[in-house]
């Protein structure tokens, strides 16, 4: 394991490794211990008590964070006719049909989110092996396969984030930047927490929020006290 830098160790020393902080304290500490020389992302990791091997315990979706993420998302929309015009009017960065399928097959990836109307999924499906591993494949569960392309694009531009539980049951998400006011980051955190609470599978047993941590892009993690989380 690579040795951590002196700056990292100094930042980590400000955190009590045995303590679980309330959300406000955790966010404030994460900001304070950021060691990056740029406006780093503030990230959260929820370790959930789910068994992702079971189909009814798969957690995936999307949520619009009230204060956005601070990141500009480049949106590619696969649509035609009136729906293509709607997507362009809503602010999509790229709108098209087969020409973008070819571009992607040739290695073009200058976008962050892909939206498609259902009638375009036959074409988009050709990109499954390319988009799937990158987490870019449109999916009805995240609202990216839809006829309402206007709403989809506007929500993404407003700060919509997708979340998905990994095999280990961990959900990672960005809740903003270190330049955000603490209360705005806390509001984003609680919005995501509420969504995950509502997504709890009925068959999930035992403790649901096993552990939660807040961190910045390069900073140390801060453990969050989950005892006040309501289920």
Swiss-Prot record:
CDD domains registered for this protein in UniProt: Ribosomal_L1 (cd00403)
Keyword Ribosomal protein: yes
InterPro entries: Ribosom_uL1_bac-type, Ribosomal_uL1, Ribosomal_uL1-like, Ribosomal_uL1/biogenesis, Ribosomal_uL1_3-a/b-sand, Ribosomal_uL1_CS
Gene3D superfamilies from the UniProt entry: 3.30.190.20, 3.40.50.790
GO biological process: regulation of translation; translation
One GO cellular component, as annotated: large ribosomal subunit
Top-level lineage group: Bacteria
This protein's record includes keyword rRNA-binding: yes
SUPFAM superfamilies: Ribosomal protein L1
Keyword tags: Repressor, Ribonucleoprotein, Ribosomal protein, RNA-binding, rRNA-binding, Translation regulation, tRNA-binding
A GO molecular-function annotation: structural constituent of ribosome
Pfam families: Ribosomal_L1
Quaternary structure annotation from Swiss-Prot or TrEMBL: Part of the 50S ribosomal subunit.
Functional note: Binds directly to 23S rRNA. The L1 stalk is quite mobile in the ribosome, and is involved in E site tRNA release.
Recorded family membership: Belongs to the universal ribosomal protein uL1 family.
Protein's UniProt name: Large ribosomal subunit protein uL1
Gene of this entry: rplA
């Amino acid at each position: 394991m690579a040795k951590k830098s002196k700056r990292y160790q100094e930042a980590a020393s400000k955190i009590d490794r045995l303590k679980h902080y309330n959300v406000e304290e955790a966010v404030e500490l994460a900001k304070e211990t950021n060691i990056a020389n740029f406006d780093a992302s503030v990230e959260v990791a929820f370790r959930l008590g789910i068994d992702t091997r079971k189909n009814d315990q798969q957690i995936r979706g999307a949520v619009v964070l009230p204060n956005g993420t601070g990141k500009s998302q480049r949106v590619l929309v696969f649509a035609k006719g009136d729906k293509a015009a709607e997507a362009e009017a809503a602010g999509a960065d790229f709108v098209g049909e087969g020409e973008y399928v070819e571009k992607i097959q040739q290695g073009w990836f200058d976008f962050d989110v892909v939206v498609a109307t259902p009638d375009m999924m036959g074409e988009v499906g050709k990109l499954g092996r390319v988009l799937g591993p990158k987490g870019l494949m449109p999916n009805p569960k995240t609202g990216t396969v839809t006829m309402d392309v206007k709403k989809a694009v506007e929500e993404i531009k407003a700060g919509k984030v997708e979340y998905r539980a990994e095999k280990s049951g961990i959900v990672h998400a960005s809740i903003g930047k270190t330049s955000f006011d603490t209360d705005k980051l806390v509001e984003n955190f609680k919005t995501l927490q509420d969504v995950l609470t509502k997504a709890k599978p009925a068959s999930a047993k035992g403790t649901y929020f096993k552990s939660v941590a807040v961190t910045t892009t390069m900073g140390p993690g801060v453990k969050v006290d989950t005892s006040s989380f309501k289920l």
